[in-house]
């Protein structure tokens, strides 16, 4: 680590590799060159050999790792003949500018003893060599990196004149040295310099006699222990240049504001040459009081993670009657968010510490070079959005406006906002990066609490001072920091900020309304700049030969020019607001006023700046500055959109974006209002500060229900809307070539109306027929014709003949919360749900630079798949699934535009060529299906992942040909998760049959979200093909074993059975577990004892014993006294328990096997003319191999005369004909079978939410059935629907069911293999049949 230690004598430490530098005439360049030549484990020693011993100017910087940050401090120093001074609460003196004379003020021995006794807990004892001195740790002066750059510039200018300057050095340490007071002017002093100082003292006493009196009184007698800890330093400097007397009276301007490139480049350059980045360097420096520059700010920057950043802050005193009073360092990090103001409070308590010269210091890790640090989080009280100046209050609070970051507006956003603090450090000890510029020759006035005023005898703030900084910081449209206060002529007088001071005045700042207006104006400038950059990029693409939709970009140059004019207009507005509202007065009786620089950031003449460093940058520094622009991204753009969906709240975000419609335009229109077409910065788009995403989803569902209720109540699908019922709000901008888009209001609901530009009434009527399947549209024909003749206000008129009922179409049956709803029609115009406040995914990615993180990506992908699954279940293809037809609002709600009517029209396809499936390009009509949407879906996923337009370097014609005939696809980035890469490759497969369905895709994303198939918890029962074969063999072996044993046995003696325990009770019997001849058996003791004498019962039981089947519970025999039946005992439990009690989840193959086995068992029973009549999941049992066994059959037929209807069948599974008391046949079991299949697939109880009786009644008399999930395969959906048909003759037999299941099996296997391959197969994700575009940026 680098350590700068004070060498208190002239003895050199003759260690290995020592570098001895004579202190006479030392300059900054000499020092830096010497530091550059040092290496690891070297010691750099600078000896003070100047014989003038009355000037004490040594540096002590401790740089060792510790949770405590140590800063260099300045001892109180006073110029002879003056009682005025600059008060710095510290003890160590630092190098001051050329020709500056210093003297350490003498304190009496008794006063010194009092100070030693009254040290508060904020004092830290340092040991330097053989002497000790005190450091007030809570009032350290903080570094200022801008000033260091200015020092280097000034030093270069002064090198040619250094022979005219006299260097005064001293080799004593800073402390309470009684010999210093009388030896300030000695024989080695420059007489010109002495004359200048005396001249300045004369002016100073003349103008500030009040302060002389106050300080003399305070010096003669101090009344509090706190005031005794205050050190006083009075420093006067002159800028002695070659012009001598003429320039001696001129005021020295403050360091100029550096542009970001110069600031960071030169900081890094100094850092590399002065500190070497070597952790083991031990550089010991005792610096003379030689002049470094004319800025009073010294900076030590450290690029190592193990080094502390220490410095002190000296302030130049010009040769004038103005005094600068500094106590508290400024906290102005360079890269704080825009319009954010920290309110820093003094630390209420500090801890007493005694630290020697080996004290460790805070380490700064994981920071890029020259990255400023933030104040400690303990010092941050509140964060406010504001635009104003630094303010001061009597309570000691320090309000600072932090400057904006220096990266360009288009820098990639990083949404990870973190407070960069020093762990364990005092909030005062941080990097000071403020820059105070002065346009005129006046000085800044900085107030502090510890100045010894006449009425100030007590310190009420424990060393925490207020700073009245006159700098006004704002970020220009070019994203550079401008800190340029303009000081009017006159002397700035200072006063105490102590609340007891009689002349204390509160300063006045900008009012809240002006601040808010300034903030909004700045945001609008940033938006315009981002929009301009996007348009320039599009123009460049067109110039490179990319001609997609080139017609829509014809006026790009004009639009860019308009944006530039608008930016200038807004900057002028900022100027006027600043000039009219930003003046304020200093505290006390100051006559000086400070105002913002009236010049616009773009109109400022760079030649007026006193800094010319940027013009002298080398190529390497320019390159480095460009790298820093990327690395040091704007902190106001850092939000955690990437970490979580529920993060990155932006309360100030304001969406004024597209008011799109559900129907979309030619490109599914991202419609924008003509008044405002831009949105906020992309990372400020999403806003979910107070509520979670789930709550926004709930609101979306409520809005969806409200809109569907509006449609139902007004019968909008069956009758048109009268034009007089709607209100035209505004015409929306759209890329649609076929329609005019209007924002309308209907019954207090905002909607979108698409007015066709084509006045062909027949064509418009045909389109309306397709959407609404209207049987009576003649009434609106005339209105459609008149609409064309009467322009906008008559296009919705309809005649009185359009009141007849219209039959709903399949399009009116498509309703989903994530789909833009079809609302109705008015004349020839179609009305859709409005997407106001939403922006298309295309615009968010390509216009606003939004980066999609994985959590948001999965949400968008799943919502789209859910909508598309519903459309395909209705046999409707969307036809235009692109990033332009997908919309998002600030709460991450996804909407997909309404499907196109010409979705599969090969002659007039609705979709863009780069999203078009290859079979459409090849005009293969027999291959056109809903899978064209799956193909387009893959490109939407790719676009969201890469933030690039598909095939951006090809025109439309080239893309269509290369995709269709060369199988060209964009290259998927390797940073994309493997499972997503595989999914995309499957979706854009060349053959439609190889593409998955949206139901498969939806289940995949359910799995990625931690859910597999069903939301209910439980274990997954899976089955593969090998297990299926093995279990079939086991089932047959056990069945054959039992059959052989029972051959010839019909009756069992009850005393041959050992009853173990009761295991349950059913409708007809109590069930017990028993042991019979070594076999576990289920003993069902019938409740109706009269049955034992019924020969029919005995004959029925006998027939059951002979009818063995692997999927039917095996009957072992019966006992007449008492009447009971013996069956095999199945320890797997019932299917009802598995699905609804244990909540076991089933994979597709297990589902298929259960359904298939159940069909086999029921087919066997029906083949021997046996009806079950109580087929429910409770009567379906599983053995240890999870094989299906049907139980409790056959008895209902015998007991039909004795049992009530409710006892025959459970009401939930009861067929309508049984409920109605009609004649029935074996089809009652088919009805129940359909409900059991529904249970197996969904894991839900049939008619969930209704009791048994109500469900049976609604099923019989209202034809009510449970809702089949949209992700259910179409073939299985059709089978279930057939099985629970109201008409028994429409239900299939179990033989027909088995035939359908055999054809369905391949789809189940394909579904299983698709999911398993995506999740488990580690093979390469690339498709060998595809050619990947290597030119596409991945």
UniProtKB/Swiss-Prot annotation:
It catalyses: L-seryl-[protein] + ATP = O-phospho-L-seryl-[protein] + ADP + H(+); L-threonyl-[protein] + ATP = O-phospho-L-threonyl-[protein] + ADP + H(+); L-tyrosyl-[protein] + ATP = O-phospho-L-tyrosyl-[protein] + ADP + H(+). GO terms for biological process: hyperosmotic response; positive regulation of gene expression; positive regulation of protein import into nucleus; positive regulation of receptor signaling pathway via STAT; regulation of cell differentiation; regulation of sorocarp development; signal transduction; sorocarp development. ATP binds at residues 699-707, 727, 1063-1071, 1084. CDD domains: STKc_MAP3K-like. Transmembrane segments: none annotated. C-terminal tyrosine kinase domain is capable of autophosphorylation, in vitro. Residues 212-231 have a biased composition (Acidic residues). Involved in the development. Negatively regulates tyrosine phosphorylation and activation state of dstC/STATc, probably by activating a dstC/STATc phosphatase. This is Dual specificity protein kinase pyk3. The gene is pyk3.
